[in-house]
Design a protein with these regions (language model features):
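N-terminal short beta-loop-beta anion/metal-coordinating cradle
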Residues: 2-112
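Conserved active-site and cofactor/substrate-binding residues in soluble primary-metabolism enzymes
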Residues: 43-47, 117, 121, 181, ...
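Catalytic cores of processing enzymes, dominated by hydrolases/peptidases
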Residues: 147-230
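A conserved C-terminal secondary-structure "cap"
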Residues: 208-312
């Protein structure tokens, strides 16, 4: 493997600001990370990243070489043409940024398109950055398509070696093989190297998984802020407002839709309530319910990923 440091470059001004922040944050910084392009049902992670960058002060600390990592023919960046010339190019960027929450507390955000190649080298580069920037906890987040109804609270699956930071959420999975991602490999390699990592996956109703689902993003954001101590009330308020609007629109579409969709949602509600009831009784008197098998979970992930890649 080539030297991972060849994949990124430091921004001197941003790095100097991080060093100043580290002098005041003896425990280290939190780093959030999410990449666009893999399974992110309900655009859960994308919504959080977009709102952070739109609403919070930030500056670039390190920039990855996207020419090495992004396959432009697979995900063609947009250029704007006006009259007789190209006027704008939406350059893909994979950056580490220093961000301030509402109280001014610093944290890091690594985001951009998911690398298409050199995953191992990329994961090693992220580890170098984590070491250099004194990261105490790395947190990734996304949505996964699940057989759950939109009329019930959004479930979470915490993963990594710091799931204790998101108590009260038991994983519905025993063991499952799903298509890999750079985000997951980074988590795996960081844990392997002894770093603290937390992943938060929201359960998004599979029938709306390809549309923005603010409820999922809000639930994930609340879990992240509770686990890290970050203060982001403006983003939470924005997501809560959008979530109310989205739920109203989903209910309207279901009421105006065919009977098959109504039956589907009703069946998912019954299944959800049966599982919740079984858990509250310790599974001692639970009636049998249909829980997705590992193979079914893997197929659902593959189907969603194939549909997403087909749109690109």
């Amino acid at each position: 493997m080539l030297d991972p440091q060849g994949l990124y470059a430091w921004e001197p001004k941003g790095l100097a600001v991080v060093d100043m922040a580290l002098a005041q944050e003896s425990a280290g910084l939190v780093m959030l990370y999410h990449f666009d392009g893999y399974i992110d049902a309900g655009e859960t992670g994308d919504q959080i990243v977009d709102r952070i960058l739109d609403s919070q002060p930030h500056q670039v600390v390190a920039r990855f070489d996207h020419d090495r990592l992004v396959d432009y023919r697979a995900r063609r960046p947009l250029l704007t043409f006006k009259r007789d010339r190209w006027t704008e190019y939406e350059e893909p960027t994979i950056d580490v940024r220093l961000v301030q929450d509402t109280t001014g507390a610093p944290f890091l955000l690594l985001s951009g398109p998911e690398p298409d190649v050199e995953w191992e080298r990329f994961a090693a580069a992220v580890q170098q950055i984590v070491e250099r920037l004194g990261v105490r906890l790395s947190v990734n987040f996304h949505g996964i398509p699940m057989g759950v109804p939109h009329t019930r609270p959004v479930g979470l699956t915490p993963h990594g070696n710091r799931t204790d930071l998101v108590p009260g959420h038991r994983s519905p999975f025993d063991e499952a093989q799903v298509p890999g991602s750079a985000e997951s490999l980074v988590e795996y390699r960081l844990m392997e190297a002894g770093f603290d990592v937390l992943g938060v996956a929201a359960h998004v109703p599979h029938y709306i998984a390809r549309s923005p689902y603010p409820d999922a993003a809000l639930t994930v954001l609340e879990a992240i802020t509770a686990a890290t101590g970050l203060v982001l009330p403006g983003i939470a308020h924005s997501l809560r407002t959008d979530a109310h609007r989205t739920q109203t629109e989903i209910d309207r579409q279901i009421q105006e839709g065919d009977e098959e969709l109504t039956t589907l949602v009703s069946g998912l509600e019954n299944q959800y309530d049966a599982v919740a009831g079984a858990e509250s009784r310790g599974n001692m008197l639970a009636e049998p319910v249909d829980i997705p098998s590992a193979d079914e979970i893997g197929l659902e992930f593959e189907r969603f990923l194939a549909e997403r890649e087909g749109d690109n």
